[in-house]
Every structure is written in structure tokens, then in C-alpha cells.
């Protein structure tokens, strides 16, 4: 089965109608392709960070995530956004599971700056993703 990676930004992930339409298309093709789905959610991270009194810092258009803000990133991207998408995809008949790059050491990397949790990926481990795909999960 061919593998397809789909990456969307947070704005698209927040558009329920567009995301539902994408899920329906993916469901129609799920017997031909193994889909891997990656989502953003930066605006929601910024919003929730402000609730906790944390200010989002950007350098050259890239978020500079502090250790404190990393907790918010995990909550928003690995929790709220992730489960919202899993539930929506499940409604379209897709076997969905939500994980993060930290799970199964899918991605490992190095910080781009001292004291920042923003990094660059320097290694990938697809074992967990392959196991899920072999069992029919997105």
C-alpha cells in the first residue's frame, strides 16, 4: 500500500468543514493508501499560552518555545487539537489514533537555540507509525 503524508497548518485544522471533507476523501481512499496526518495549531498554542500568562516569542518567524510554553504546546497539540482531529476522522470511518513525535521516539532533534524547546529534527524512527499503518490505523 502506498504511504501518503498530509501536513496541515493550525488554521486548516480549525476549519471543521474543510477537515471533515478531507476526512471523507481519505476514507474513500483508505483501501489504496496508508495515510499519515500531521497538524499544526500555533494560533491556539499562542491563545492558551496567554491564558497562563506566557507570551509567545518569535525570532525570524519561528516560535522560540520556552520550557514553560512547551507544557502548553503538549496540551494543545498533543491533547486538544489531536483528539479533536481523531474524533472528526473517526466520524468519517477512519481508524484514527493520535500520537506526537515524542511517542515511540518518532522524531528526535536538537534545540535551535540555548534555552529553547524549538528544534530541528535530526532523526526519525518510523517503527510505531509502520506498526499502526499495518493494523489499518491513520
Language-model-detected regions and their locations in the chain:
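Nucleotide/pyrophosphate-binding catalytic subdomain
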Residues: 1-138
Amino acid at each position: 500500500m502506498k504511504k501518503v503524508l498530509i501536513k496541515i497548518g493550525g488554521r486548516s485544522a480549525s476549519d471543521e468543514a474543510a477537515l471533515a471533507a478531507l476526512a471523507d476523501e481519505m476514507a474513500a481512499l483508505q483501501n489504496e493508501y496508508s495515510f499519515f496526518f500531521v497538524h499544526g495549531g500555533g494560533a491556539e498554542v499562542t491563545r492558551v499560552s496567554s491564558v497562563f500568562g506566557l507570551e509567545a516569542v518569535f525570532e525570524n518567524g519561528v516560535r522560540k518555545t520556552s520550557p514553560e510554553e512547551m507544557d502548553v504546546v503538549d496540551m494543545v497539540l498533543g491533547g486538544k487539537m489531536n483528539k479533536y482531529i481523531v474524533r472528526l476522522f473517526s466520524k468519517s470511518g477512519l481508524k484514527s489514533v493520535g500520537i506526537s513525535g515524542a511517542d515511540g521516539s518518532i522524531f528526535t532533534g536538537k534545540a535551535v537555540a540555548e534555552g529553547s524547546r524549538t528544534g530541528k529534527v535530526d532523526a526519525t524512527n518510523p517503527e510505531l507509525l509502520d506498526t499502526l499503518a499495518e493494523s489499518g490505523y491513520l
